[in-house]
Design a protein with these regions (language model features):
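Short glycine-rich or small-residue beta-strand-to-loop segments that form or flank ligand, phosphate
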Residues: 3-9, 64-68, 165-171
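Internal alpha/beta core interface subdomains
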Residues: 116, 121-169
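Residue-level detector of conserved catalytic or cofactor/ligand-binding positions
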Residues: 185-195
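N-terminal phosphate-binding or glycine-rich loops at protein starts, especially the Walker A/P-loop
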Residues: 1-37
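Short connector loops at secondary-structure junctions
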Residues: 34-44, 168-177
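Buried hydrophobic positions in well-ordered alpha/beta secondary-structure cores of metabolic enzymes
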Residues: 10-13, 62, 115, 153
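Loop-centered beta-sheet repeat module
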Residues: 162-186
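N-terminal glycine-rich phosphate/adenylate-binding segment common to multiple enzyme folds
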Residues: 43-136
Length: 195
């Protein structure tokens, strides 16, 4: 039996999670769902979009399934996704992209996995209103996070028999921040066990 946090979210979130729960149940997987709510709908009841009880549930169960969650646009509330990433140190975002069998597509033999650092850069969500006509976002890149995501990406490539790793940056424009990330990634590329 598995204890899993289920964050139902809001908007289309509950509809999606209900369907996923039915599919998992039909597959015969024995799960005890720890149902939690987060998002815009929760603000009215609890004053925040991501109550501490949700984070505690994920930490306790060590696994969660989260549906779409709305964060109100404007001042006052941090994105639920950004909060979860920070609180749980969810630094690596994997996005696989590949062709499905028997489905015709414009491009054949697509098999790409994008690995994105999830806690820094503009995803840190550090912003301020300079004046009524200007807003500012801060792009933070640190050596520690850059080394950690590069290590993760290259280890993933080795473990999954990937032949190539492409490092994507805007180092031509953001010479210091993306330049730091690029330099640290190139160190990992030069290791003999790397693709």
């Amino acid at each position: 039996m598995h204890n899993i946090t289920l964050i139902k979210g809001d908007g289309i979130g509950p509809e999606i999670t209900d369907a996923v729960v039915k599919i998992i149940k039909a597959a015969g997987v024995d799960i005890v769902w720890d149902i939690q709510t987060a998002g815009a709908d929760v603000i009215e009841k609890e004053g925040v979009p991501l109550p501490q009880r949700v984070i505690d549930s994920v930490k306790r169960n060590k696994i969660a399934l989260k549906s779409p969650v709305t964060t109100p646009i404007g001042k006052g509330f941090r994105s639920v996704n950004v909060q979860l990433r920070k609180e749980l140190d969810l630094y690596a975002n994997l996005r696989p992209c590949y062709n499905l069998p028997n489905i015709e597509t414009r491009y054949e033999n697509v098999d790409i996995v994008v690995v994105r650092e999830n806690t820094e850069d503009l995803y840190a969500g550090i912003e301020r209103q300079v004046d009524e006509n200007t807003a500012e976002s801060i792009k933070i890149i640190t050596r520690a996070a850059s080394e950690r995501i590069a290590e993760f990406a290259f280890d993933y490539a080795v473990k999954n028999n990937r032949k190539e790793v492409c490092v994507v940056t805007k180092a031509n424009i953001c010479k210091l921040s993306d330049g730091l990330f690029l330099d640290l990634s190139l160190i990992h590329i030069s290791e003999p066990t790397r693709p």
